[in-house]
Curated annotation (Swiss-Prot):
This is Oxaloacetate decarboxylase 1. Catalyzes the decarboxylation of oxaloacetate into pyruvate. Seems to play a role in maintaining cellular concentrations of bicarbonate and pyruvate. Belongs to the isocitrate lyase/PEP mutase superfamily. Oxaloacetate decarboxylase family. One of its GO terms (biological process) is pyruvate biosynthetic process. Binds 1 Mg(2+) ion per subunit. Mg(2+) binds at residue 88. Keywords: Decarboxylase, Lyase, Magnesium, Metal-binding. The keyword Magnesium applies. InterPro entries: ICL/PEPM (IPR039556), Oxaloacetate_deCOase_bac (IPR023687), Pyrv/PenolPyrv_kinase-like_dom (IPR015813), Pyrv_kinase-like_dom_sf (IPR040442). Its cofactor is Mg(2+). Substrate binds at residues 50, 159, 235. The keyword Electron transport does not apply. It holds the Pfam family PEP_mutase.
Length: 289
């Protein structure tokens, strides 16, 4: 079978956005997982920012990974991927000019689409970790991203957090990003279908949801009718890999009979030590969770 080019995969992603169906992403974090996801028939994969931080730095999701580190991992995946890969580009690694550099590098890496979010990252002195940038700044980032891409088939997706503002404020933000030219709108923190319907009724571009398997949003047909085309349930495959590594090495060391049997979430917490970063952020930056 002939290998699909990066542009082929970008067109394939756009076909997903233009369809009438809802697709769930595979968590793709290295070349092997990309090949497995494609072989199993997944229509789209995602390289999550949090997963990249874990894979590259063994660090929690505190915007610690650099653009070059993220792009290197995306490039490794892009060499072999035969499914469209969506890159979670966080805040674009800086201001609107940094966003342009991010788009240039990720386009060269071969991703089919990328999200740029309006969270105030990295955490700022004296601010909450969930604060968002002004909508005007977010619009500037989306416009800059569109200007920077060379291949117009690369999808630029604006992401915002529906869990930290009122529904009315989220509607204003998403409409602004749509007007700026975003190919799709991604939202995290949508509570239920009632909230989603209120927001979706004001938008015409395709939607992407990061649900983390929210049981209140478990209806693909209803999601599709509301314009949702991409759903990110989380990154279970990556955490399963952590658990499998731990269990295998534990068995190899003859420790399988010990009472300790940590879950994947507990293992991630143990080996990334997020409480240290939270303490440092409070001590040195007065950051409020």
């Amino acid at each position: 079978m002939p290998k699909a080019s990066h542009q082929d995969l970008r067109f394939a992603f756009r076909e997903l956005l233009a369809s009438g169906s809802c697709y769930h992403t595979a968590s793709v974090f290295d070349p092997m997982s990309a090949r497995i996801a494609a072989d199993l028939g997944f229509e789209v994969g995602i390289l999550g920012g949090s997963v990249a931080s874990l894979q590259v730095l063994a660090a929690p999701d505190f915007a610690l990974i650099t653009l070059s580190e993220f792009v290197e991992q995306a490039t490794r995946i892009g060499r072999v991927a035969q499914l469209p890969v969506l890159a979670d580009a966080d805040h674009g690694y800086g201001n609107a000019l940094n966003v342009m550099r991010t788009v240039i590098e990720l386009e060269r890496a071969g991703v089919a689409a990328l999200t740029i979010e309006d969270t105030l990252l990295p955490a700022q002195f004296g601010r909450k970790s969930t604060d968002l940038i002004p909508v005007e700044e977010g619009v500037g980032k989306i416009r800059a991203a569109l200007e920077a891409r060379v291949d117009s088939s690369l999808s630029i997706i604006a992401r915002t957090n529906a869990g930290v503002l009122s529904t009315e404020e989220i509607i204003v933000r998403t409409q602004s990003y749509q007007k700026a030219g975003a190919d799709a709108i991604c939202m995290v923190g949508v509570k239920d279908f009632e909230q989603l319907e209120q927001i979706a009724g004001h938008l015409s571009v395709p939607l992407m949801l990061v649900t983390y398997a929210n049981p209140n949003l478990h209806d693909d047909e209803r999601l599709a009718r509301l314009g949702v085309r991409i759903v990110v349930d989380g990154h279970a495959a990556y955490f399963a890999a952590i658990k499998a590594t731990y269990d295998c090495l534990r068995l190899q060391r003859g420790q399988q009979n010990k009472s300790e049997n940590l879950t994947a979430t507990e293992l991630s917490h143990t080996y990334t030590q997020p409480e240290d970063y939270i303490r440092w952020a409070k001590e040195y930056m007065s950051v409020d969770e």
